[in-house]
Regions:
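Short, surface-exposed polybasic-aromatic patches that bind anionic ligands, especially phosphate groups
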Residues: 45, 54, 180-193, 197
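Acidic/proline-rich low-complexity IDRs
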Residues: 97, 156, 179-182, 201
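Long, low-complexity, polar/charged, intrinsically disordered or flexibly structured peripheral segments
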Residues: 188-211, 216
Length: 470
């Protein structure tokens, strides 16, 4: 490992004895994929289905439903918070320019959809006079122009920049649907206010081009601003180059674990596909896809319709609940690892299960177990061989690395002497003792579970002279 800047560097040593590690995970889930609306390449924290609907809309009309279905399954399986990042390829932005009230009218205000996409073409706006003279009201409609389609109303707006009710400032801060731009009309006073209009549609929005690995790579890179460790899923995405881009991002950060959706095909086909993915301990595949009752049906519609979704989002929700109830040391698998909302899956034979589990790129099976329901019965990463082939081992190592890095930040630029070594020893030992006591490390005593060495033997003078402490 090269040491090129001041900081804390943690090196892993995978010993033959397998640790059980983990507790109170710092992980947060992240979904990256296509959506009708929402900010592009901007990880957006959502803590409920309703909040997702507010920020990204409900079921998609112009792109696939992989992301909204993933969000729905995540929260249905106990997930509490996640980042959603929309990816898109050059989508068009819906806009409408409004003229002012002068006799020689000129453009005064542009109303644009909050973000690009064809969804913005479903917006309409109306401008009316406010109760107070010299101000105007703005009404935003979505999906129609009746009172039931009103989604936002803004009253007593002004086009005077010095006014406390200046329209762009007041609307852009709070609106989930539109942004306003002052077009700097050459007219003055209240004549700069937009003229009264009724149900004017926005236009120009488009889905854009087909999304490729380029857009996914940009969406992944946007998570560099998220400092927490991530459980990452690309809802519905099984393309080799895209999944491998996610694995590459995880390996570059070393605190990201990728949950990969299995393909909607036979176990043999899944084994071929998994073998094409990068053999990394930072990723795991879950198969087969899940059949669920279609949640996109309108209230009162005929029930019983089902659809198929990737397993990754439900597994991400399960990982979140397992982390909170047990810790990262516990594999998100077993008879208690029930996936909610599942009505059926492809049935796997014992021979299928054997091949999935023993393959060079193992696949974690989801099975129906009488008395337990549809449960995850696998905890293997895509890396075969060493002990980090197990999901809880790799995620525990991520947790330990990040925790120890955070806990020892105080050591940067401290005098590298016995006093610092004692502080580091005490800090790390205290953390690992607590970690062990909660079930994260094997051993009946702390000394059997771990050791901490910070002394003159592993800190010789030549390393001290280089500014390192080990």
């Amino acid at each position: 490992m090269a040491f090129q800047r001041p900081g804390v560097y943690v090196q892993e040593t995978l010993n033959p004895v397998q640790p059980i590690a983990g507790t109170n995970s710092e992980f947060i889930t992240a979904f990256v994929g296509e959506d009708d609306r929402g900010p592009i390449n901007t990880p957006t924290l959502v803590t409920s289905w309703n909040q997702y609907v507010t920020l990204f809309g409900s079921w998609n009309s112009y792109t696939n439903n992989d992301v909204p279905l993933a969000v729905y399954m995540f929260f249905s399986n106990g997930g509490s918070q996640l980042y959603v990042t929309r990816v898109a390829a050059s989508p068009g932005l819906s806009t409408r320019s409004l003229n002012d009230r002068a006799v020689s009218a000129s453009a005064t205000l542009q109303v644009a959809a909050k973000n690009p996409g064809r969804w913005g073409n479903d917006l309409n706006i109306s401008i009316s006079n406010s109760i107070e003279t010299g101000y105007f009201d703005l009404v935003v409609y979505s999906g129609g122009t009746t009172d039931s389609n009103v989604v936002e109303t803004f009253t007593q707006l002004s086009m005077t920049a010095s006014d406390a009710r200046y329209a762009p400032t007041n609307v852009n801060v709070v609106s989930n649907y539109v942004t306003l731009t002052d077009l700097n009309s050459s007219n003055t006073g209240t004549t700069r206010n937009p003229a009264v209009v009724v149900n004017q549609p926005l236009a120009g929005g488009s889905v854009g081009n087909a999304v490729s690995v380029t857009e996914y790579t940009a969406g992944l890179a946007a998570h560099d601003t998220v400092l927490q460790s991530l459980v990452l899923n690309l809802p519905g995405q099984t393309a080799v180059n895209v999944v491998n881009a996610a694995i590459s991002y995880a390996e570059g950060r070393d605190d990201v674990f990728v949950v990969v959706d299995g393909i909607d095909n036979t176990p043999a086909d899944q084994l071929v596909r998994s073998g094409q993915y990068t053999p990394s301990s930072l990723a795991a595949v879950y198969y087969p896809p899940l059949t669920i009752t279609d949640p996109t049906l309108a209230p009162g519609a005929t029930t019983g319709r089902t659809l198929t979704v990737g397993a990754g989002a439900a597994v991400a929700g399960l990982i979140s609940t397992t982390d909170n109830s047990r810790g990262v040391y516990k594999a998100p698998a077993g008879l208690q690892a029930r996936l909610a909302g599942v009505v059926s899956t492809r049935q796997l034979t014992n021979a299928n299960l054997d091949s999935l589990n023993t393959a060079a790129a193992p696949v974690n099976a989801i099975r129906f177990i009488p008395g337990s329901g549809y449960v995850v019965m696998g905890a293997r990463t895509l890396k075969a061989g060493y002990i980090d082939k197990y999901v809880p081992v790799r995620r525990s190592l991520i947790y330990l690395r990040k925790s120890l890095t955070d806990l020892t930040q105080f050591a940067i630029f401290e005098p590298n002497n016995e006093g610092l070594w004692r502080r580091l020893d005490a800090t790390v030992s205290s953390f690992l003792t607590q970690f062990w006591s909660q079930g994260g490390l094997r051993g009946t005593t702390p000394s059997q579970a771990f050791f901490v060495k910070v002394d003159a033997e592993n800190n010789p003078q030549y390393l001290i002279d280089q500014g390192q402490v080990n």
